Regions:
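ATP-dependent carboxylate-amine ligase catalytic core
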Residues: 4, 9-19, 45-137, 153-155
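Nucleotide phosphate-binding/pyrophosphate-handling subdomain across enzymes
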Residues: 20, 115, 120-125, 132-143, ...
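A conserved segment at the C-terminal end of the G1
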Residues: 26, 34-51
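Beta-strand->loop->alpha-helix junctions that form or flank phosphate-binding loops
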Residues: 53, 178-181, 193-216, 230-234, ...
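Extended acidic/charged loop-beta regions that coordinate divalent cations
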Residues: 105-154, 187-227
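C-terminal helical cap/extension that packs against the catalytic core
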Residues: 181-202, 217-218, 281-282, 325-383
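Glycine/aspartate-rich loop-and-adjacent alpha/beta segment that forms the canonical ThDP
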Residues: 388, 393-408
Length: 408
């Protein structure tokens, strides 16, 4: 159920923890998590105590609630959820209100961050913005990263309608930081709403087309214009420049050293976004819509020029697979199709193979279990994509097999 009335009531019953926090509220079709990860890492590098609320999680629900870059522990999370359960039960008994899962996790995040006395909370929307549970807060800055066709059954069937929903995070007099690659139709809607609310609109400069790839202590970084990040691809250059705009504003408003904070961008990590585990020859990427496929293809060509890839792909039944797969076919030597382990219907691997063969009959396609596909010996680099949920499954399998010294 979308809406804010019961979210406000839930927060009131748990003591309004949001009033103790300074929020940076981030919406967007793609890039929310990466932009948030840049900001969280930079603020922590400046010496601030940070909270970072994001979704979905990949392996453990604790990942949604990061305090100083570390997932909250089970005991603290259970304590917060117990308090929320008591409030939710009372709301159901007294008013017939049924608190949703996302409302509960959003309230838990506010409780946990307030309890940890976080200086800043990086606060990611779940879906849309206007009616999203995260939107009950009054932030110190708002951010909209990108707009594309997604969740059409909830947000609308045009870019303009989706932009209107995302623009719901804009608050009176609070500056909006807007991604550079916003479509014109979306920009018009968002700028009009910002003007109504007397909110200034700030955009970063264009990201450079190219960057230099360097390796430090076995970790690949891209560098450009004196900046350095582990996150690969032009889209991550765009996300970093957007985060940098926000950080510069925060440094002016809250009087901290911008240069020291900005050095934290180099430490930012965001799992299943062009992630390569130590000693692995597999790229894990949660790309799940046609726009993401274009970004993935572009990044593969930039980081591994001239290479072909063996793709492992699985997705949900409601996704636009044709456009996604068409984008990847020119880079593919083969596709292995897997089912996503979820209560949501998964796209049938045989249907996916038929889709590929309809426009690329020469490409090898097969079906396999995820574990088998990951372990298969192939002559080319493997790329796992199609769903963040699928990446979570794969990373969970890897966690059982070896220690991974990275957050996911």
């Amino acid at each position: 159920k979308l809406g804010l009335e019961q979210t406000r009531e839930l927060f009131r019953r748990i003591g309004s923890p949001e009033r103790k926090l300074r929020f940076i509220h981030i919406a967007g079709s793609n890039g929310k998590g990466s932009t948030g990860a840049f900001l969280e890492s930079a603020l922590r590098n400046a010496g601030f105590r940070t909270g970072f609320y994001s979704s979905p999680h990949l392996v453990d629900v604790n990942e949604r609630f990061m305090i100083n870059g570390v997932p909250v522990d089970d005991n603290r999370l259970a304590e917060a959820l117990d308090k929320i359960r008591s409030a939710a039960d009372a709301m159901k008994n007294e008013n017939g209100m049924r608190v949703t899962y996302f409302e509960a996790t959003t309230a838990a995040a506010a409780l946990l961050f307030a309890g940890a006395e976080a200086d800043f909370a990086v606060w990611e929307t779940g879906m849309g913005g206007r009616l999203d549970a995260t939107s009950i807060v009054t932030p110190v800055a708002t951010v909209i990263t990108t707009i594309s066709m997604e969740h059409k059954e909830y947000l609308g069937d045009t870019i303009g309608k989706i932009a209107f929903e995302k623009a719901g995070i804009i608050k009176p007099g609070i500056p909006l930081f807007l991604g550079r690659s916003i479509p014109q139709e979306a920009y018009t809607v968002i700028a009009a709403r910002a003007k109504e609310l007397n909110a200034s609109v700030i955009q970063p400069p264009e990201a450079p087309e190219n960057a230099e790839l360097i390796i430090e202590n076995g970790i690949p970084y891209q560098t450009f214009d004196g900046r350095k990040t582990r996150l690969q691809g032009r889209h991550q250059r765009e996300n970093l420049l957007l985060a940098e705009c926000v950080l510069r504003y925060l440094a002016e408003q809250f009087h901290f050293d911008f240069a020291k904070a900005a050095r934290g961008f180099a430490n930012a990590q965001w799992s299943a976004r062009f992630q390569v585990l130590p000693g692995e020859n597999t790229v894990f990427d949660g790309a799940h819509n046609p726009e993401c496929a274009e970004v993935l293809a572009s990044t593969l060509k930039e980081v591994y020029p001239g290479e072909k890839f063996d793709f492992i792909y699985g997705t949900f039944a409601d996704k636009d697979c044709t456009a996604f797969l068409k984008t990847l076919v020119p880079l593919a030597t083969s596709f292995t199709f897997v089912k996503v382990d979820s209560t949501r219907p998964s796209r049938n691997p045989q249907e996916l193979a038929a889709l590929v063969h309809a426009f690329a009959p020469e490409i090898s396609c097969k079906e396999a279990e995820l574990k088998t596909a990951l372990e298969a010996k192939v002559p080319h680099r493997k790329v796992l994509c199609g769903s963040l949920h699928l990446c979570g499954e794969a990373l969970a399998l890897r966690r059982q097999e070896k220690y991974i010294p990275t957050r996911y």
